[in-house]
Design a protein with these regions (language model features):
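Short beta->alpha linker loops
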Residues: 34-35, 112-116, 137, 259, ...
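Short, basic, glycine/proline-bearing loop/turn elements
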Residues: 79-85, 128-134, 226-228
Length: 390
């Protein structure tokens, strides 16, 4: 029976439900940043410093948010970002989120560090999805990941460039983050208060990193997986690797994790089809600037050479509209869909997308536009961190 989620009117409503339903370690994994979480907070608060210009007595009928991202038609300029541990927010989480995205008309991106495997998602969806790649020291395993993504008919590869080393994530360390949770006294006590989550997890076999276990050398169980992942992220990743990965993949390539114009120029020259201005949701380098602050300089540098998107900090349709007005031709959402997933599964993801769409649509109308293609920075006023008018 379909639930009535009409009372869920904003992403914050979904966050509060997810916090109540999810085990603490997995909620904290979603809703936290690195070190002091300064960048994590700035990612959202800097959006609030941007103001719209309201226009009145204009025709608001026949509005459209439709556009294209790397040539793919999308209902709005949004793709679901790759997020690790998604299947721990809700049982079979990646499958449910992919289904919701497919039905809504936006792309879904599967993380290397997903709980459901590439094959799991492919078997349970019909639209091609995107796959996100971490570059590992085990190049044979990495090349096999690319082959598996090809075999699953993935339509784009998202290369994450900002995780050569792992950021200092204090909550994850204190919680002893693992998938599945270790049977410690603290975890067992917390899990006892999450009966719905536990029952759903008992009804699935997907409880660990299925892209890795059974595929990487000498990784057949959880004990070996822990040491393997801590050793495998490759700190030697370079632009030469990007060229090699592009050749191996042979399809659409998106580079995620760009924050500076110089790196954006290298991404454009690499032959990538799009780049994502992103600080990994504030989970890598703390005390760097917010993604929305970094966006205008990147757009100025390469906006005519490559599709520029952004993620990190998006919690509303207004945020998406502001990013578009500042030059982002697409966005990616992580926490916004994860809150919906943790709260109500597939229906929750759908509700999150409906909320974002409506907020963006109505806000665009109030700025005097009916088609997203016509929207530019003229809809914005200056901010405290940008003294000149946009």
């Amino acid at each position: 029976m379909k639930r009535d989620l009409s009372k869920m009117t904003c992403i914050e409503d979904l966050r509060l439900v997810a916090k109540r339903k999810m085990p603490r370690m997995f909620y904290d994994y979603i809703d936290s940043g690195s070190w002091t979480e300064t960048t994590y907070r700035d990612n959202t608060s800097d959006f609030k410093d941007i103001r719209f210009r309201q226009k009145v007595l204009v025709n608001m009928e026949g509005r459209s948010l439709e556009t294209k991202m790397i040539g793919q038609n999308v209902k709005m300029p949004v793709a679901i970002a790759p997020t690790g541990f998604t299947g721990m927010a809700h049982a079979d989480g990646e499958i449910l989120a992919a289904r919701a995205a497919e039905k809504f008309g936006i792309p879904f991106t599967l993380s290397t560090m997903s709980i459901c495997s590439i094959e799991d998602v492919a078997e349970n969806t019909s639209a091609p999805f995107w796959f996100q790649l971490y570059v590992m020291r085990d190049r044979e395993f990495m090349e096999n990941l690319i082959k598996r993504a090809k075999d699953a008919k993935c339509s784009a590869l998202v290369l994450t460039a900002d995780l050569q080393v792992l950021g200092q994530r204090h909550k994850d360390i204190k919680n002893g983050l693992s998938a599945p949770p270790k049977p410690t006294i603290a975890n067992l006590i917390n899990l006892a208060t999450k009966p719905e989550w536990c029952m759903k997890m008992l009804n699935t076999e997907r409880r660990t990193f299925r892209n890795i276990v059974g595929h990487a050398k000498n990784v057949g169980d959880l004990s070996s997986l822990s040491s393997w992942t801590s050793e495998q992220f490759d700190p030697r990743l370079s632009w030469d690797d990007v060229a090699r990965i592009k050749d191996l993949w042979g399809g659409k390539l998106i580079i995620k994790g760009i924050m500076e114009p110089e790196d954006a120029e290298k991404a454009a020259k690499s032959g990538a089809d799009a780049l994502v201005v992103s600080n990994h949701g504030g989970r890598q380098l703390d005390d760097t600037v917010s993604a929305i602050k970094a966006l205008p300089d990147v757009v100025s540098a390469v906006g005519s050479d490559i599709e520029v998107w952004m993620d990190s900090g998006i919690r509303s349709g207004q945020d998406i509209l502001k990013a578009w007005a500042l030059g982002a031709k697409g966005t990616m959402i992580g926490r916004a869909f994860l809150y919906g997933l943790g709260a109500y599964g597939e229906e929750g993801v759908t509700r999150a997308l409906e909320i974002l769409y409506k907020e963006m649509d109505i806000s665009m109308a109030f700025t005097g536009y009916r088609n997203i293609q016509d929207v530019d920075s003229s809809i914005l006023r200056s901010t405290r961190w940008a003294q000149d008018e946009f």
